[in-house]
Amino acid sequence: MANPLYRKHIISINDLSREDLELVLQTAATLKARPQPELLKPKVIASCFFEASTRTRLSFETAIHRLGASVVGFSDSSNTSLGKKGETLADTISVISQYVDAIVIRHPQEGAPRLASEFSGDTPIINAGDGANQHPTQTLLDLFTIQETQQRLDSLNIAMVGDLKYGRTVHSLSQALAKFNGNHFYFIAPEALAMPNHILHMLNEKGATYSQHANIEEVLPELDILYMTRVQKERLDPSEYANVKAQFVLRASDLIGAKENLKVLHPLPRIDEITADVDKTPYAYYFQQAENGIYARQALLSLVLNE
């Protein structure tokens, strides 16, 4: 059977069918159980981060090294020709694509990875996050973690809490989970940071069900997954940030009455929306979730670069 992801650009989670997602997750499970340290040797992958990142960049680079490939790139675009000399993104990508087998790109501008894919020729572009738009590889590790903890991706009750307006992780994850049957979403956010209408419209089109709530407590007993997010200071003006940053904070005492199988996830970094006492509960799974980023990204890279 042909690999449908070979040399494919991964810009949006909507670029992947349910079958594609299942292939990535199966591959991730295999690589987690049985590492393959020479699978991508001697390929070279560019890591181009035009926006600050810790987990995504390091997990991508770890994934690349553990598959036997080499990584080149930058984590601060201000020291590149684009940053210092005014080179266009199109020209930057046109040149880098001549050097490498794939390009991982994070950019603050929505649509930048899609634009990059128009100038990369045959070199695949993998979106590591573009503004408030999409974060498909975070979604892959989230799906992998949900499947790992719940043994399924359908018929789940999933709460998404916090910044649902600017949080690209919840945009991508809700769209991905809508490809699976029977999932219900509980959206819990301040009115100013509610899930955008275009995401709700997409869920309606796919037949997914959702409800919107003012607090976690009223839905907690129903939940299988509680997906917390931080309020993104960098995308808000100071007065708006001050008004909403502490509106939804999860404490260990809030988890009394939760289902035994509940897992609390977070794309990280957290600020103060999950208190440290939650870390000691059996529900906390966000650090294991972060580790799973290595396996999900290994799986995607191996499928994109191996026929």
Curated annotation (Swiss-Prot):
The lineage of its organism: Bacteria, Pseudomonadati, Pseudomonadota, Gammaproteobacteria, Enterobacterales. It catalyses: carbamoyl phosphate + L-aspartate = N-carbamoyl-L-aspartate + phosphate + H(+). Catalyzes the condensation of carbamoyl phosphate and aspartate to form carbamoyl aspartate and inorganic phosphate, the committed step in the de novo pyrimidine nucleotide biosynthesis pathway. Heterododecamer (2C3:3R2) of six catalytic PyrB chains organized as two trimers (C3), and six regulatory PyrI chains organized as three dimers (R2). This is Aspartate carbamoyltransferase catalytic subunit. Pathway: Pyrimidine metabolism; UMP biosynthesis via de novo pathway; (S)-dihydroorotate from bicarbonate: step 2/3. It comes from the Bacteria. The keyword Transcription does not apply. L-aspartate binds at K85, R168, R230. PANTHER family: ASPARTATE CARBAMOYLTRANSFERASE, ORNITHINE CARBAMOYLTRANSFERASE, MITOCHONDRIAL. The keyword Transferase applies. It is an enzyme of class 2 (transferase). PROSITE patterns: CARBAMOYLTRANSFERASE. Keywords: Pyrimidine biosynthesis, Transferase. Belongs to the aspartate/ornithine carbamoyltransferase superfamily. ATCase family. Gene3D superfamilies: Aspartate/ornithine carbamoyltransferase (3.40.50.1370). Pfam families: OTCace, OTCace_N. GO terms for biological process: 'de novo' pyrimidine nucleobase biosynthetic process; 'de novo' UMP biosynthetic process; amino acid metabolic process. It comes from Photorhabdus laumondii subsp. laumondii (strain DSM 15139 / CIP 105565 / TT01) (Photorhabdus luminescens subsp. laumondii).
